[in-house]
């Protein structure tokens, strides 16, 4: 399901968790809230310059080297839908074995509305991966 049209490569630096600089202000209470969150998704919202990146990168570092974290840094160039989804899918693939290359291929498929094909595939793969993890954790905890 590959396309013949040329595709710009993804910038892998956008998927690298920024290193926390020495002297960065610690956010122990917020780090604890992130660590103890029970939902599968946490949204962090604050104005520019209020420490979101520092908070999330320090939290990700606190999870240890084996933690799987999908990180994506976006800029104004990433507001084109297919470009955005390519980056998001790429970031999710770094953190989850449950997201296949077929999703990226679907996004670039000729003759179709790519988001109509790729986004449902991605959501189905994430749901299946989540179900497998839940099934595995329930069998290991009994």
Regions found by a protein language model. Name each.
Residues 2-33, 101-107:
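Conserved adenine-nucleotide phosphate-binding loops and their immediately adjacent elements
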Residues 32-41:
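Phosphate-binding P-loop
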Residues 38, 50, 54-134:
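Conserved phosphate-binding/catalytic loops and adjacent sensor/switch elements of nucleotide-binding enzymes
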Residues 44:
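Hydrophobic anchor at the beta1->P-loop junction of P-loop NTPases
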Residues 47:
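P-loop (Walker A) phosphate-binding loop of NTP-binding proteins
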Residues 127, 139-142:
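Catalytic acidic motif of RecA-like/P-loop NTPases
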